[in-house]
């Protein structure tokens, strides 16, 4: 196979299954896909299927220059962010790298969604239903720039509230009313022309460290229509993951957050027939992607763990 596509993951150290999905999608469209991943150490699971590129921390002053050099040195065609701060880095890189496809929304959207307070204001401005701000019990405290469930506290008693305020700086957090209900992640894709290609809700049945380890696709029309509305409100493109919770007592649908990137359990939607990895390749190749609503409902994903081994003298 003579035709190649080189993909650079940003923060994709554990995304082995997604890397394999990209490789298979490449085979499907007649290309050899090579995976590279920008990491702080060489001892990451992604090394099993790709090449690790030793990198800098996201906050490093030289991050853009180093990534630009990496893109040139490894002849990168597509850049895919897997952590929130990397979406901002990608948006900035997009301005200085030609002939490279970046799977990101606009810088303004990425910057807004990275900050919990800014995103809350964005939701309010666009008249979306969000949990009220406040620390009346019970409440959830979210680190303003936290992601993947990091820096999140569920505070349900006065004792827990006292402990939270004793151990944390309140201004670093967004406090919201705790909403008990069913959580949904919605895997969306918009092509390079901002056309919505697919919207797949999946119910989060079990989570570990903020990531779904058991989820099932559900053709929930209310959530699909609400997601479509949201995607038309901002300058979104590429993969977008929207988080909702449906309140147990009222059936009200609250938006929790938007991650303008691939979600950690996007493989559920890919296996269901909404192959976002293939969409990304087609977008890079400037091939039209037809809208896809023909995905498998009630597909259950159960995540397992796999060990990887390295010789580290």
State what each model feature region is.
Residues 1-102:
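ATP-binding N-terminal substructure of ATP-dependent carboxylate-amine bond-forming enzymes
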Residues 30-32, 172, 237-241:
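Short secondary-structure junction motifs
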Residues 46-47, 62-65, 110-117, 209-210:
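Short, charged, surface-exposed secondary-structure boundary motifs
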Residues 74, 219-313:
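ATP-dependent carboxylate activation and anion-phosphoryl transfer catalytic cores
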Residues 87-88, 148, 263, 267:
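Short glycine-rich, flexible loops that bind phosphorylated cofactors or substrates
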Residues 107-180, 191-195, 221-224:
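Active-site nucleotide/adenylate-binding loops and adjacent lid/helix of ATP-dependent enzymes
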Residues 156-235, 245-254:
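Phosphate-binding site of ATP-dependent enzymes
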């Amino acid at each position: 196979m003579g035709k190649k596509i080189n993909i650079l993951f940003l923060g994709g150290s554990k995304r082995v299954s997604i890397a394999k999905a990209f490789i298979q999608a490449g085979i499907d469209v007649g290309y050899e896909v090579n995976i590279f991943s920008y990491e702080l150490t060489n001892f990451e699971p992604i090394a099993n299927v790709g090449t690790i590129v030793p990198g800098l921390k996201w906050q490093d002053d030289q991050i853009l220059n180093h990534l630009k050099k990496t893109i040139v040195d490894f002849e990168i065609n597509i850049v895919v962010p897997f952590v929130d701060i990397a979406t901002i880095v990608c948006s900035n890189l997009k301005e200085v790298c030609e002939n490279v496809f970046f799977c990101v929304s606009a810088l303004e959207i990425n910057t807004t969604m990275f900050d919990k307070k800014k995103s809350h204001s964005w939701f309010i401005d666009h008249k979306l239903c969000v949990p009220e701000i406040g620390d009346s019990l019970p409440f959830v405290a979210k680190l303003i720039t936290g992601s993947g469930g990091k820096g999140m506290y569920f505070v349900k008693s006065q004792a827990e509230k006292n402990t939270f305020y004793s151990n944390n700086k309140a201004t670093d957090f967004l406090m919201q009313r705790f909403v008990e209900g069913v959580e949904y992640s919605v895997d969306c894709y918009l092509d390079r022309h901002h056309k919505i290609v697919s919207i797949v809700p999946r119910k989060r049945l079990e989570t570990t460290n903020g990531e779904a380890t058991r989820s099932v696709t559900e053709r929930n029309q209310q959530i699909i229509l609400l997601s479509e509305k949201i995607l038309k409100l901002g300058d979104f493109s590429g993969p977008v993951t929207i988080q909702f919770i449906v309140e147990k007592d009222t059936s009200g649908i609250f938006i929790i957050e938007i991650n303008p990137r691939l979600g950690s359990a996007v493989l559920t939607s890919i296996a269901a027939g909404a192959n976002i990895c293939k969409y990304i390749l087609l977008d890079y190749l400037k091939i039209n992607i037809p809208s896809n609503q023909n995905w498998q409902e009630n597909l259950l994903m159960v995540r397992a763990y796999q060990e990887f081994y390295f010789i580290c003298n």
